[in-house]
Amino acid sequence: MEATDPSAEIELYTIPAQSSWFLWDDIHEIERREFAEFFTESSITRTPKVYKEYRDFIINKFREDTCRRLTFTSVRKFLVGDVNLLQKVFLFLEKWGLINFSSSLKKNDHLLSVDNAKIEQGTPAGIRVTATPNSLRPITAPPLVEERVETGIKVPPLTSYSDVFSDLKKPDHVLVCAHCGERCDSPFYQHNKGIVNICEKCFKNGNYGENNTADDFKLIGNSAAAVWTEEEILLLLESVLKHGDDWELISQSVSTKSRLDCISKLIELPFGEFLMGSASGRLNPSILTEDENTEQVQTDGQEHEETETREEKEDRVNEDEPPAKRKRVALISEGDSSLMKQVAAMASKVGPSVATAAAKAALAALCDEASCPKEIFDTDDYSNFTVDRANGEKDTDMEEQQEEKDGPQGLPVALRIRASVATALGAAAAQAKILADQEEREMEQLAATVIEQQLKKLQSKLKFLDDLESIMDEEEKVIEGVKETIIQERVSVLQCAFRSGITKRWDHTYVK
């Protein structure tokens, strides 16, 4: 037998019959019509040579292992260029059966029984064979099937379960980034026309593709909830402690999340409620807790000093404790706040002068109901007044007992409460009067401003009229001067005529 020349041998490549127009060394008219952008010579990156390199590489990549299905992701890793054009070329070759035609099996083909499997020898009748020139691989005849196999798919001996059935576990529709080729598991950006999807990372890096801008894409939430990183969570907690419940400032601090995302994430955190309570306590230091209010309403000087010392110690302890262990501060408007706490809070919100005026108004109001309301806040005067009033009715011993009983602690509680309530109401009324006076002053100031502007407008009009009058006077003077000049010229003309001997009669005839 004669030795065969390896260079003369060619490689067989099986393609469908409908793709018989395909040639390795040429570009068919169908390809030119489908990819007109490669043949217009509008760009150096879109030429017939570039298209042929794309096509040949994709087909050769599939020929490396025709038993597996070629994906666009595996091709995209080795090619550089416009992702849209690469995907278009890939889909075109797959449509005409130039790739993936022998692996386009249904998902349940591996479950077929032996009776349903059909094995043929040689090339089927509907397949045409074309040759690839300059190939170093010799022609090999298809192996004969000696014995029937159990399944319709032949796999290598060391193939694992995940390699065979990994495609079945994948979802039917996987979103892939058109630029980097990775899956879009997180929220991604979709083109307004719905032709391109890019991941969030590529969008932030500015990889929009050719002839695309950031305005051409819209954010699509692919996952049920946005993914929070540790840095974003720490920034959220810091913003909540700093700004309280001002979600606008919090969302500005956490620039990657919206207000709704920040609220939802804080609700999900196990210590979010305590954190909000701690933030409210820091932002409203004038609002006191129940124990502090109870101690603050004590009127005795010594007990008041002890209360302040105790409160300062508690504040230092609370500052050292973590935010989650702080007690939430009750608001004034809450229903469980006592009357004395509300009175103390209302009185603390006004100035000393307003509080003094309110106290005087409260005493004046109480004078109409009680005979000695003013002496309640002055123990010495109240005791002396009681002694003078009781003179003649009780003896000296009874007067001494009365003096011992009367004092700061001997005053009726109901009268104290009424005095405190009247003081708070008077403070509120005084504050309202101050606000009303302030509004009235502002109205007077605005009215004065309007009057001043009207006066300025009137002055400008008067000035304009004065200027106009001066201009008219100047024009009148000019006209008078012109009149005098004309009269003088006429007189001179008549004098010249008389000197030349023109008679009066001739003059009249000439004139007629």
From Swiss-Prot:
Q: What Pfam families would the database entry show?
A: Myb_DNA-binding, SWIRM, SWIRM-assoc_1
Encoding gene per record? SWI3A
Q: Which domain of life is it from?
A: Eukaryota
Q: What happens when the gene is disrupted?
A: Plants have an embryo development blocked at the early globular stage.
Q: Give the subcellular location.
A: Nucleus
Signal sequence, renumbered to the chain: none
Q: Which UniProt keywords apply?
A: Activator, Chromatin regulator, Coiled coil, Developmental protein, DNA-binding, Nucleus, Transcription, Transcription regulation
Quaternary state and interactors: Homodimers and heterodimers. Interacts with SWI3B, SWI3C, BSH, and the C-terminus of FCA, but not with BRM or SWI3D.
Which tissues is this protein detected in according to the database? Expressed in roots, stems, leaves and flowers, but not in siliques.
What is this protein's function per UniProt?
Component of a multiprotein complex equivalent of the SWI/SNF complex, an ATP-dependent chromatin-remodeling complex, which is required for the positive and negative regulation of gene expression of a large number of genes. It changes chromatin structure by altering DNA-histone contacts within a nucleosome, leading eventually to a change in nucleosome position, thus facilitating or repressing binding of gene-specific transcription factors.
Q: Which GO terms describe its cellular component?
A: SWI/SNF complex
GO terms (molecular function) for this protein are: DNA binding
What organism does the UniProt record list as the source? Arabidopsis thaliana
Q: Which GO terms describe its biological process?
A: chromatin remodeling
List every stretch annotated Disordered: 291-325
Quote the protein name from its UniProt record.
Answer: SWI/SNF complex subunit SWI3A
Q: Give the SANT domain ranges.
A: 223-274
